[in-house]
């Protein structure tokens, strides 16, 4: 299959992240994103690497039997919701299946590795759950009228005005419509990403789920030729505040951003009305949030996530952390740290984003917590500087996971238990392999769905340091005579019972090349080992390769691999 090939296939399964495996009539497998199991799709191959083909979705020819829900009007054009046509219970089943496969491919199944996979907790709200949106200004087609919404799927320039978006509530939709109507009526140009000319860039909207407080931040350039900015912004404020809302307006802001990059960046913010912040509540604690604060976008889902983590940490003994020090690494605005502070001696949070650390300190004071300490800096460097050692470690890293060197330093503390909260299962699977190789075992895993209708999912893992099941005390006397062990026999016995040298994939490949004169791929060795019922988890890269469409080894190579396995006494 070559680049540019246009074909059809039926989606056999979907692997995380959102990678559908479409099977053609000829049995070829192609990765096609944004698909659902059971769909018949048309695709165009746009990438071929290592005999693995990836295609761009052109059309869904036949719907999946799973698709029984009516989508919002923007489904298919907007790049936001992939699973909106699938009933919610089936959505979370799909996510659970994807994460289970990733984890079992990386560290083994529940039975093989001895952990418990509890399942998945759904979001309390299935729609209108988001507390934050970043809308972009632009047009829906070249030189079209002003649009305000989300980027079209697969497009850098074109937008979709998501006036009926179903993952936010009516207040968001009212704000979007009021803003678009106002600036359209005044003929204000948007910032063109190609020419870097124009005024309107983004509209950031946040609404607290518990308190109902709303803040809106209009992000623009400083290019004000042709209109009076002060009068324009006064009119914008009036257009917003004269509408009806279920919530209450806490602030209207204006942020300037002349950066070329198409991101929401703060180069100076002024308050047009009210305050520059609002308050949200989680599990009895209060949090002050600004337009640019990091905070989970699903408040009720966040409560489920953090409650799951807290249950993993405390278990059946709610006093287990009394008098102990907890490290919250990659602590963000300190949400988890503050939830754990009442049940331990001290919580030390480490976060690289300085603004988030300032917010964490302010929120801890707001909640009357004086045993929280937050440090701004890279976890990799800060761990070398902290003198007090932790009794427990909580990990909540960004999407890319934990740097291998940082994992090494974390493991050196030798804490009995850790909890790892992950927003990207592929990074989690990779990191768990390292923890297990270094003496930790996975005890429990649970997924939490924070993002209904999308493919994203959070995962919570409890890790514990491996310990002996029991101990036997034996008194041994060395020397000559009855009941004693001769000293000179110890070396002989040690040599006789010395563990066999670990047989690596590299050794197998070198043996085959030397004897047969050809090379074999690591994934081929893993495939043969799998067929023979042998463990493969000592070679994560090989296991990862097995998940991708690849030709099978020839019978000649299979026999060569088996010969090598016999030579090294593996079989």
Where are these regions (language model features)?
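Terminal RNA-binding accessory module
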Residues: 1-74, 111, 373, 381
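Rossmann-like S-adenosyl-L-methionine
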Residues: 2-7, 13-17, 223-497, 505
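Extended interfacial segments that mediate partner engagement and assembly in macromolecular machines
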Residues: 59-70, 79-190, 210
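Internal alpha/beta scaffold segment
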Residues: 157-201, 222-254
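Short, charged amphipathic recognition helices of the HTH superfamily
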Residues: 499-510, 521-522, 536
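DNA-recognition alpha helix
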Residues: 504-516, 526-532
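Short Lys/Arg-enriched helix C-cap and helix-to-coil transition segments
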Residues: 536-549
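Phospho-regulated, low-complexity intrinsically disordered regions of nuclear gene-regulatory
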Residues: 550-571
